[in-house]
Each structure stands twice: as structure tokens, then as C-alpha cells.
């Protein structure tokens, strides 16, 4: 009997499941609220509930496996630490590619002379003096560094030299782009490195909290972390590559869906607090997206399961549309703590809501609060105005946005603190709406109702309240969530089949078919959309929200037992898998260059180069699998040799790609 505890830390809940992996049986489950300012509280609560229903001893547990949506949520919401980016051998035009400038925002970037040519040769000497000056300037202004060099996948020398110098001067975490991907495309590698650097502190907090709870509970087994492709990494290894845990939660949920429902082919929709993750199972497994996961509008270079993540969940921020004469609501993509949930921790929130309701004139910031998520106090790299706001919320607890943001300048500072993950936002959400309708009642009904009243009296451009009653407002909110969820599912299905992104959402006639209010009788044409596959819905609120969504798409719905902890189940059922790619190019007639992780080497024939690359790929994949925690490793090689036939019965060699995959058990 091989016993494994799976954990899944989401934005709202932390779930745990105890599995007998050999028998394929769920023995116990537990659920606790995620405590973002101290993750160990939620983790400890979930693990304690599982162990309370377990007759054995803690040392009977062979492994703890952790999946999380926190990295995915951070990317979707634009939350994370301040990063310094070093672009080596690039000019400023690189920022306009791969949306790199938008990803950086206000974070600093330095352009350093250096980099390499496509054949791995040096393009220009590395400017050590410029690096040294920038490192000393930034060491107290950022939380981590990202380094991307021109053609670093063909020769990583300048990236590694930069990393070593930054580490010596600053001691801060550093991400090199060549360590995350062996593919070409410098700006996209830089984007992936920036996201990775931004997530390091977040994942470190989560892993440290988990290890502390394991120690308290007497669990001495290894801790593993789920990657975005559903495979596992040892926790210490994962700390150097946190961006690989983007889509960790959704990937674990896919594994959990296959385990719980026994499904071979289906659409899987996992609704959480922040996001809805949609994927398709074929023969019991998801398709891998080798060119990189698309998350929150960013095309990364992280190999992951083909999962589409939408900023749409039970805790999506609800915003009234105040311009124009029609009014209405928008949802997400930012997550907000539901008012009904925040009131459990701070009951005084209801007094603040009542005070706003007693004002004669509604304000756009009504029912919107911020609260501190700074266990170590305000970071010193904040601006003076940001530090002042941070200290005020630490002292006061939940604070109306209107009190902090009397000007646009102050509102910008509040938004920056939220985006850095230092302040939490609380506002009306679909979870609150479900409390008002009675569909969900676990939190504080009174706080939800007060929020609904404040939202309903907001006025559109014609001066008319956007909803007649709080119940109408709640139903509008849930209708919008269901409509957007159905649209996302159909969009994902068409994109999966090569039809492009948002094909239905961008078509007014097709999008209209998902509105609860039917098209006008004056409309000459009406259409409907139907999915030709079954739907498996996962998540704590799946049973609440997905029946009307399934009806809108005309599909058969399954919400399996333990659907609310599917991510934890999938985390426990995972195995270790590491993939490596080595490329071969031909810079001269009799020179075949093998681009290895520690620099290129040359061979005089293609056969010799292929033989060397095969051995190197297998050795590197096996070494990484062992570092990731695998035993009993199986190796598999694939090759893509690109040749162009010539008229002289000869082939012109273009490139060879050698792929090695190492798989093994984690226990």
C-alpha cells in the first residue's frame, strides 16, 4: 500500500486528499480556507482534517504532493515581486515583441552589450562594468532578477556570467532564460524569465509553509510539487523554476478528473475562485502544448498541458458599468475576496458597509475595500506614498478604497500595492451573489446582502439604478458568470480544433445565443451553439454554477464525487517526468555544432554529432529526473532531423532536434 497526501492550494480554498495509489482509492479528504497572509494556517487545517480520518501513523505516508493555482492566479492578475530584467545583446525593439514591455510594466530593464550569434559564436563582449553598476543600483530596489541573452540557447555563457556576478553582488534569486527553455525566441524567453522571477517569493512562501506543517504533523516523507504538465518535481528543485508550476493546479485537476470520473474523452472545466481552467481529455490524457502555455494573455515558453485559463471564477471582481444608458456588470479578471468571506474574519466590515449604505449618494468605490497581506511589514523598496498606505492598512485592517484613494494618484498607488500582492482587494463577487440567492450559504449572508444593495443602487449614464433589487443584482451577476463560462467553453473547444482564440466571443450573433434574455423577435436570424462532448465540472462551486452552463451548451454534465478536491487527488496521483531538447546546427561545411546546456561543441560529421547529442540528451534528462525526485526511470528518445532534398541526390542539412524524456515514480 503506497499512501500519498495530495494538496491543492487555491486562491480561496486549500484542499487535501489521502490516496492509496496502488489501489486507486481516495481514503480521506479535507478542505480549509486559504489564508493568504499565512499560508500555513490553511494548509495545516486541510492536512489535519485528512489525518483525523486516517487510522495509520504519519510515517506510513510515503509522499506529500502539492499543486497550486497561486502561480497561475498571480500571472492572470499581474501580481508578483518587483523584477530587474537584464537583456544581453538586444536593443529596445525587443521590448515590443512578445508583449515584453507590457509584462514588465514599471519594473526596471537594462540593455547590456554582449550576446551570441545563431551559431553560438560571440556577438560582442559582455559589458561587465555596466552589469556591475546596474547590480549595485538595483540590489535594494527589486526582489529578483531575470536574465535573457541573445541566442542564449545556442550559447549560455553570457547569461551564466551575468547570473554569477548578480549573485555575488546582490544575493537575490536570479532566473536565466536558457534554464527554462531551449527554444529560440529571445523576447519570449525573456518574458518567461520575468514571470519566473516574479513568482519565486510566492512559491518559496508556499513550500516553506507546507514543510513547516509537515514537520508539525510528523510527516517526514518527501514533498513534491506539480508542474504545468501534471508531472512532479521535488520541492527544492521547483524553487529554481517556479514558472513551471504555472498551470500546476489545472494540470492536477485534469489528472484528478481522469482518476475520479474514469473519463477518456471529455471537456474538463475547473472553476475556482480566480479562474476557470478548460481542457480536453483524449484517451484519458490531455494534449501537451510544446510551444508554451498561454496564461492570462501571456504566451510563455513553459511546456504544459493544453489548458486555457480564463479570469473568471466564483471570486471574480464584479464592476458596475456606469457609462452609457444600458448599464450592466463586468466580471474579472481580477480576483476579490468576497465580502461574505472577509466579514467572517473582520465582522466590523458590516458596519463599514452599513455606513456606506446610509449615505444619500452612491459612490463608485462603494463596497470596495483593501486589507493587508504583509506578514513581514511593508517592504522598504516601496515609494514613500506606498509605504504610508501600507502602514495605514496594517494598522486599520479592512479599509474602504475611498478613504485611501481620494485622488487618481492615490488610487494608482493602491492598485500597485494590490498588484504586488501586498494588499488584498475585497468587493462584491459571484460568491456573494450566490449567498443572496440562497444557492450558497457557508459565509456571512448579511455582508453579501449589504454589498448587493450597494451595488444595485449604482447608476448608469442615464441616472437609472443598474438593478431594481439586491436579488435582481445577484441574478444579473450569476447570469453573467454562466454566460461567460459557456462562451469560454465553446471558445476553448474551437481553439482546440484550430479555430483560433475567442472565435465565438468575437462573433456578436453567436455570443448572443448564450444570453438568458432571448434575441428580439425583430431579429431575422438567431442561432444556437452545441458542444458534441460530455462535460466534467470540477471545483467547490461546480455543482452550484455548472448545471445552467451545461444546459446552455446542450451537453451531459458530470460532477464526480470529490470534484471539490480534484486538484488534490490529481496531485497525489502524479509521477515525475523531465523533457530535454538538444539542437544541432551546421555553421560550416564540415562542422556540426551541438548546443549543450554548458556551451556548444563541434563534430566533423552529422553521425558523430547525432551520437553525441543522443547521449547528452539522455544523460541530462535522467539527471534532471533524479534531481526532481524520480526512481525507476524510463528513457525515451525522439528525433527531428530537418533536411532539404537537392537536385544532386544530396540533402541540405538544416537542423536536428533531439528530444529525451525521462519518466519515473516519485515514491
Question: How would you describe each model-predicted region?
Answer:
Residues 1-667:
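N-terminally biased helix-coil "hinge/interface" segments that flank
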Amino acid at each position: 500500500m503506497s499512501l500519498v497526501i495530495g494538496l491543492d492550494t487555491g486562491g480561496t480554498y486549500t484542499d487535501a486528499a489521502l490516496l492509496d495509489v496502488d489501489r486507486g482509492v481516495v481514503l480521506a479528504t479535507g478542505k480549509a480556507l486559504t489564508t493568504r497572509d499565512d499560508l500555513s494556517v490553511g494548509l495545516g487545517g486541510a492536512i489535519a482534517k485528512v489525518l483525523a480520518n486516517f487510522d495509520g501513523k504519519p510515517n506510513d505516508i510515503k509522499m506529500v504532493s502539492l499543486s497550486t493555482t497561486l502561480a497561475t492566479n498571480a500571472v492572470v492578475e499581474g501580481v508578483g515581486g518587483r523584477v530587474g530584467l537584464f537583456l544581453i545583446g538586444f536593443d529596445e525593439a525587443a521590448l515590443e515583441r512578445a508583449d515584453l514591455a507590457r509584462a514588465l510594466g514599471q519594473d526596471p530593464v537594462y540593455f547590456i552589450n554582449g550576446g551570441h550569434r545563431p551559431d553560438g559564436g560571440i556577438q560582442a563582449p559582455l559589458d561587465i562594468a555596466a552589469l556591475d553598476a546596474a547590480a549595485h543600483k538595483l540590489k535594494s530596489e527589486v526582489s529578483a532578477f531575470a536574465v535573457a541573452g541573445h541566442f542564449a540557447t545556442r550559447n549560455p555563457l553570457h547569461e551564466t556570467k551575468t547570473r554569477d556576478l548578480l549573485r555575488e553582488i546582490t544575493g537575490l534569486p536570479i532566473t536565466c532564460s536558457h534554464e527554462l527553455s531551449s527554444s529560440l525566441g529571445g523576447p519570449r524567453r525573456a518574458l518567461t524569465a520575468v514571470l519566473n522571477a516574479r513568482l519565486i517569493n510566492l512559491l518559496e512562501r508556499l513550500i516553506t509553509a507546507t514543510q513547516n506543517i509537515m514537520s508539525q504533523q510528523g510527516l517526514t516523507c518527501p514533498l513534491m510539487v506539480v508542474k504545468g504538465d501534471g508531472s512532479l518535481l521535488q520541492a527544492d528543485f521547483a524553487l529554481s523554476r517556479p514558472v513551471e508550476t504555472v498551470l500546476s493546479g489545472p494540470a492536477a485537476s485534469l489528472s484528478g478528473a481522469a482518476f475520479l470520473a474514469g473519463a477518456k474523452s471529455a471537456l474538463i472545466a475547473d472553476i475556482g475562485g480566480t479562474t476557470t481552467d478548460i481542457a480536453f481529455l483524449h484517451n484519458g490524457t490531455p494534449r501537451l502544448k510544446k510551444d508554451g502555455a498561454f496564461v492570462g494573455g501571456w504566451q510563455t515558453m513553459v511546456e504544459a498541458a493544453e489548458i486555457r485559463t480564463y479570469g473568471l471564477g466564483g471570486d471574480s471582481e464584479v464592476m458596475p458599468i456606469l457609462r452609457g444608458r444600458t448599464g450592466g456588470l463586468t466580471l474579472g479578471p481580477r480576483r476579490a475576496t468576497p465580502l461574505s468571506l472577509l466579514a467572517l474574519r473582520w465582522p466590523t466590515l458590516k458596519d463599514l458597509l452599513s455606513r456606506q449604505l446610509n449615505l444619500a449618494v452612491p459612490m463608485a468605490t462603494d463596497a470596495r475595500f483593501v486589507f493587508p497581506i504583509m506578514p513581514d511589514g511593508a517592504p522598504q523598496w516601496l515609494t514613500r506614498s506606498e509605504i504610508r498606505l501600507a502602514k495605514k492598512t496594517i494598522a486599520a485592517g479592512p479599509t474602504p478604497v475611498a478613504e485611501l484613494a481620494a485622488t487618481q494618484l492615490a488610487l494608482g498607488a493602491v492598485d500597485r500595492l494590490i498588484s504586488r500582492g501586498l494588499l488584498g482587494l475585497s468587493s462584491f463577487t459571484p460568491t456573494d451573489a450566490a449567498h443572496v440567492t440562497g444557492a450558497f450559504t457557508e459565509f456571512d449572508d448579511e455582508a453579501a446582502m449589504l454589498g448587493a444593495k450597494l451595488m444595485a443602487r449604482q447608476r448608469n449614464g442615464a441616472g437609472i439604478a443598474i438593478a431594481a433589487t439586491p436579488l435582481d443584482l445577484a441574478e444579473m451577476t450569476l447570469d453573467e458568470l454562466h454566460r461567460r463560462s459557456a462562451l469560454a467553453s465553446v471558445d476553448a473547444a474551437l481553439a482546440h480544433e484550430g479555430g483560433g482564440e475567442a472565435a465565438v466571443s468575437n462573433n456578436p450573433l453567436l455570443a448572443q445565443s448564450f444570453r438568458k434574455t432571448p434575441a428580439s423577435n425583430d431579429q431575422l436570424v438567431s442561432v444556437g451553439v452545441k458542444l458534441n462532448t460530455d462535460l466534467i465540472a470540477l471545483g467547490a462551486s461546480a455543482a452550484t454554477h455548472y448545471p445552467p452552463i451545461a444546459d446552455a451548451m446542450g451537453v451531459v454534465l458530470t460532477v464526480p464525487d470529490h470534484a471539490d478536491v480534484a486538484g488534490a487527488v490529481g496531485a497525489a496521483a502524479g509521477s515525475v517526468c523531465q523533457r530535454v531538447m538538444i539542437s544541432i546546427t551546421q555553421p560550416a561545411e564540415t562542422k556540426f555544432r551541438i548546443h549543450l546546456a554548458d556551451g556548444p561543441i563541434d563534430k566533423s560529421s552529422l553521425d558523430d554529432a547525432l551520437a553525441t547529442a543522443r547521449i547528452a540528451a539522455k544523460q541530462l534528462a535522467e539527471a534532471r529526473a533524479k534531481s526532481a525526485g524520480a526512481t525507476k526511470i524510463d528513457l525515451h528518445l525522439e528525433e527531428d532531423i530537418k533536411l532539404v532534398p537537392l537536385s544532386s541526390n544530396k540533402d541540405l542539412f538544416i537542423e536536428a532536434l533531439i528530444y529525451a524524456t525521462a519518466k519515473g515514480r516519485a515514491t
